[in-house]
Amino acid sequence: MDSGVKLEHMNCFQLSYQYSWTTRKKRTLKPFMSKGSSPSSSSDSRKRKLSRAEDSDDSAVKRNAKRRRKICKVEEYYEDDDCILSDWVQRNTAKRIDKRNEEVEVMVKIESGDDCTIGKWFSDVSSKRKDKRQVEVDEDEEWEEEVTLCSKIKATSSRSRTHSLSANSPENVTDVISPCRSRSPASNVSDSIQKNDCTSSRKQSGPICHQCLKGERITLLICSECEKTMFCLQCIRKWYPNLSEDDVVEKCPLCRQNCNCSKCLHLNGLIETSKRELAKSERRHHLQYLITLMLPFLNKLSIFQKLEIEFEATVQGKLPSEVEITAAISYTDERVYCDHCATSIVDLHRSCPKCSYELCLKCCQEIREGSLSERPEMKFHYVDRGHRYMHGLDAAEPSLSSTFEDEEANPSDAKWSLGENGSITCAPEKLGGCGERMLELRRILPLTWMSDLEHKAETFLSSYNISPRMLNCRCSSLETELTRKSASRTTSSDNYLFCPESLGVLKEEELLHFQEHWAKGEPVIVRNALDNTPGLSWEPMVMWRALCENVNSTSSSEMSQVKAIDCLANCEVEINTRQFFEGYSKGRTYENFWPEMLKLKDWPPSDKFEDLLPRHCDEFISALPFQEYSDPRTGILNIATKLPEGFIKPDLGPKTYIAYGIPDELGRGDSVTKLHCDMSDAVNILTHTAEVTLSQEQISSVKALKQKHKLQNKVDKQSTEDCNEKEEEEEEELNMPEISSNENEETGSALWDIFRREDVPKLEEYLRKHCKEFRHTYCSPVTKVYHPIHDQSCYLTLEHKRKLKAEYGIEPWTFVQKLGEAVFIPAGCPHQVRNLKSCTKVAVDFVSPENIHECLRLTEEFRQLPKNHKAREDKLEASLLSL
């Protein structure tokens, strides 16, 4: 790890989004040897003579006269050539005269100084000029390469090149490659200056590159589609490596709608995000389908609230119809959570009139039943034994702050006071309340709002008698063009996952096909999702440049550092942004050649993604398959889009994940997303990859370190049972392929394992049994789990997956995600991911009516976790979404 990298424990980390961008100095155009010029003149034109401050004015005049004679000579050589450089020489001469005047002024100022001051000034000037000469020589060579390429293009293409863009504008010296059209090149340039919105803000005469807004390039390619937009060769090579010069001339990136210049990247509305408009009959059918699935949950919630009203009627000695419920303070600008279980409050709840302690109806029910848990805080103390220990060597003395064992706070003796009539006293002080006043029933929504909603839903369903659309599909047990084998279970028929092409998802029968698999809780893989988009670059450096050049971003000036996660220590590291992205494409290693795996999670923050990268956001949404479900803005079957105005919507993305990766499974410090379970549905698109190849020296070092890791694991487990057998098994595993499916590792980029919902109990049992075989923070063994899945402290390696199948007879769906593929993950399905290459993924969450029951089940599961558990907060508010 670099010495400049800071390591911090990752508990509830927040990424730093403070941006900076190095301003690149404009390069100065240099004369070059064109066709027909002599080598001597070319050599003379490159020489730069340092001006001396002590030169007399007469010598300066002679030097300028000599320079003018050389200009005439150069113009003779270039008279019939495409590249007219006389104007450049004039401008460059003017610059040198200005610089000469500045030097004279400086000399006048320091005449009164001593010799040391003058000597120091001459030393600085000489050093700067020496560096500048080297830069000029390098730039000359680069420009000559471009000229050679232009000559080849001119010789092999039918396009014509203009000798002069305007007879009245001697400053236009840039070559423009344009198609043979009836329009003159001058009119093309005029249009590019007057009509191009992206460059109109830049007031510069003559042709300029649309990308870099510079007019000093030797060769510009003009688009034959719009006949006005131009790109220089350097920008094409740097920012559009997938486009050739011919492609740009045929149709420029701006016309292709994938221009990644600073201006275009911050424009929104250029990409049509919705793939098709729904007919009225389709909308009616979708709404009926949605309400049919949601109405049972609405009825259940309504019954639950009516029971609480009956308890309140008993407390007040009235009939339920006579109970008046006071409206709580408006909560439209904030989320309301239960102060005991942290679950979101939808409508009815109890509140203390003195301390405003709020309690949800579920906690009220548990208090009356005597089953309420205090949910004490959990305390994790992972031991930091140093970097040597993480790499399988001897451990250092653990720091005093990390030598405690995992422990759980002792439950307090405080108890809730429950009246005989069902009334509840405020929570004791130890639990956050005042313990004095009775909790009163409060409401958030209008009094009859829920009953009216229930009545409207039932009326709607009875008024439209639409026959259900069904598609009897058996592809889960058959290998076809629309399926991908992902498991080898002998007792079930769901080993094949539905895997359609993105071009076919717009068909109605494909949506029905998707719904049938989705209702069963099966993942779905959509191939080539990015093929339907304009092709905007998802290269991380392009995204970083867009963030840094965002003038509206308050943090764009502090982007030089990012906080990534070190996968080996599971801790935050602060690293230079450019170094991180260089490691993304080239790889990074520790001093012992063990691969260093870093990842950026939710970068930039999802709540700012649409503002900071509007074009990327629109492109991602336009690429989403089955937009009836996945569209975070207008998906008709996405329940998360149904919240009325004024309510705070849950943060469902889009979210970007950028992480390193290599094909080999390291077993320790892999670039992984550990086993977890999302409380909502999600779709994940792989937008960019970069392959990193390990050297032979690295491979040898990794193999030796793996042996040390095995020995360390045996010591940590303090067990030598069956050591010989296990050692043989592990030795075989090192030589076995990681991917057991028929996927080609060269095309695959991310290895997914998704478990079925019905296998979760056995999976949890296995994890509890083998939890100490996993490593988490500081690469320390996991000593205790509160919830084996929601703790997110385990990743099942190939060895663990084999043991899981041998002991419990279950296995996940295992497949490799390729570039451009979209993976749909149903709510309630535990899953994990390991990167086989450096990957950039973009994901968005949604809530489908088929899986709302799983969202509510997970909400109940999360509320049973300890108070400070990171998964405990009800971020989705599934109960509110069900309304």
UniProtKB/Swiss-Prot annotation:
Zinc finger residue ranges, B box-type: 333-392
CDD domains named among the record's database cross-references: cupin_RmlC-like
Entry GO CC: nucleus
Localization: Nucleus
Tissue specificity remark: Expressed in inflorescences, roots, siliques, leaves and stems.
Position of sequence motif Nuclear localization signal: 755-762
Binding site for Zn(2+) 1: C209, C212, C232, C235
Start-end of Low complexity biased regions: 34-43
Protein name: Lysine-specific demethylase JMJ29
Naturally occurring in which organism (per UniProt): Arabidopsis thaliana (Mouse-ear cress)
